[in-house]
Amino acid sequence: MIPSLWISKTGLDAQQINMNIISNNLANVSTNGFKRSRAVFEDLMYQTIREAGTNSSLETTLPSGLQLGTGVRPVSTERIHTQGNLSKTDASKDVAINGSGFFQVQLPDGNIAYTRDGSFQLDQNGQLVTNSGFPIIPEINIPSNSTNINIARDGVISVVVQGQTQPVLLGQLNLINFVNNSGLESLGENLYQETQASGSPIETTPGLNGTGVLYQGYVETSNVNVAEELVNMIQTQRAYEINSKSISTSDQMLQKLSQL
């Protein structure tokens, strides 16, 4: 069997995965707080025919060896946690993070998840929740007779209640940072989960220790650049076509051999 057939096959598999990732990025171009991904690849093991530095004669050595590669494989998908644009909504419950950090979210199983999507809502009890209904940590309850909600840059939440002139302090929204954001596991629903690779969560007041600040009435949009993804798609398509051509050429060579 001609090795180039299998080598090209690994190239096809790799480019298909790359296309899947690009398609997912483009599909989430309108998803609040979405962070685009990129595929990371590495070459497979090599077959060493001649080692560099071995003797070519009694007095000379080979300056370079002869190694034949066996293809490529995907290693990981890396999240690119760059800042997305802030889109003005004027909704009092919308909060965007300008800078680093994540909001904390309580999951039904008791675990904690993290999100950049600050398009919050109120449930039937007046509690601040995500669009999927998951409560924000710490628990924030907005009184039903509130006339104005204020979320400061440092995360302090206060409201003005009917019949009163002084604002009532409700709580503090802190942000969570990680040593390695790319190590977070994506759960869907704009949520991430801590892993061993991400490191432990570090809770910080917005605006302190390099953490981002909060902007009320804004949401962070996806950081997907459509033009860049389309260029990546064209490159991936061309790479797929080239690997397909390699398979066709190898097949033609094999046919020639079988006719001898």
Swiss-Prot record:
It comes from the Bacteria. Pfam families: Flg_bb_rod, Flg_bbr_C, LlgE_F_G_D1. InterPro entries: Flag_bb_rod_N, Flagellar_basal_body_rod_CS, Flagellar_FlgE/F/G, Flg_bb/hook_C_dom, FlgE/F/G-like, FlgG_G_neg, LlgE_F_G-like_D1. It is found in: Bacterial flagellum basal body. Transmembrane segments: none annotated. SUPFAM superfamilies: Flagellar hook protein flgE. GO terms for cellular component: bacterial-type flagellum basal body, distal rod. One of its GO terms (biological process) is bacterial-type flagellum-dependent swarming motility. Keywords: Bacterial flagellum. The basal body constitutes a major portion of the flagellar organelle and consists of four rings (L,P,S, and M) mounted on a central rod. The rod consists of about 26 subunits of FlgG in the distal portion, and FlgB, FlgC and FlgF are thought to build up the proximal portion of the rod with about 6 subunits each. Belongs to the flagella basal body rod proteins family. PANTHER family: FLAGELLAR BASAL-BODY ROD PROTEIN FLGG, FLAGELLAR PROTEIN. This is Flagellar basal-body rod protein FlgG. It comes from Buchnera aphidicola subsp. Acyrthosiphon pisum (strain APS) (Acyrthosiphon pisum symbiotic bacterium).
